[in-house]
Curated annotation (Swiss-Prot):
It comes from Pseudomonas putida. It is found in: Cytoplasm. It comes from the Bacteria. This is Bacterial ferritin. One of its GO terms (molecular function) is ferroxidase activity.
Length: 154
């Protein structure tokens, strides 16, 4: 099925962002695991798996629309401390949210309602799961202090 070139190109852009999110969560999850922060490892590993699912859905849609996926991920921001890692992941989620909103508008403009629905589902996941959880972690660190937070994540 031939898709609109603008939609395909934007889906490719979104794919690169999802691949970056996957890779950033991957390295952060393994760092948490190495540091013995098991709860953070489990949560961020789960986020990595969800970003992989997002990338898969975009890739499948690009192929269905007769486009060519670009598997080169956007740049990563790898933190070196837990607060830096949470901040980097949150910045990435804010960026993804903005890109998804633009993509939804573009899909509606070109009457590609299936792609729009895929992006809307990813937007809901980004806002209601990923972003919300990361913001909550920042609030916990502020409320109980970093040492107590880290102890709670072992």
């Amino acid at each position: 099925m031939q898709g609109h070139p603008d939609v395909i190109n934007y889906l490719v852009t979104l794919l690169k962002g999802e691949l970056a999110a996957r890779d950033q969560y991957f390295i952060h999850s393994r760092m948490y695991e190495d540091w013995g922060l098991t709860k953070l490892y489990e949560r961020i590993n789960h986020e990595m798996e969800e970003e992989t699912q997002h990338a898969d859905a975009l890739m499948r849609r690009i192929l269905m629309l007769e486009g060519t996926p670009d598997m080169r991920a956007d740049d990563l921001e790898v933190g070196s401390t837990v607060p830096e890692m949470i901040e980097a992941d949150l910045k990435l989620e804010y960026k993804v949210r903005g890109a998804l909103c633009k993509g939804i508008e573009l899909c509606e403009l070109h009457k590609d309602y299936i792609s729009r629905d895929i992006l809307r589902a990813q937007l809901a996941d980004t806002e209601e799961d990923h972003t919300y959880w990361l913001e909550k972690q920042q609030g916990l660190i502020k409320a109980i202090g970093l040492e107590n937070y880290l102890q709670s994540q072992m």
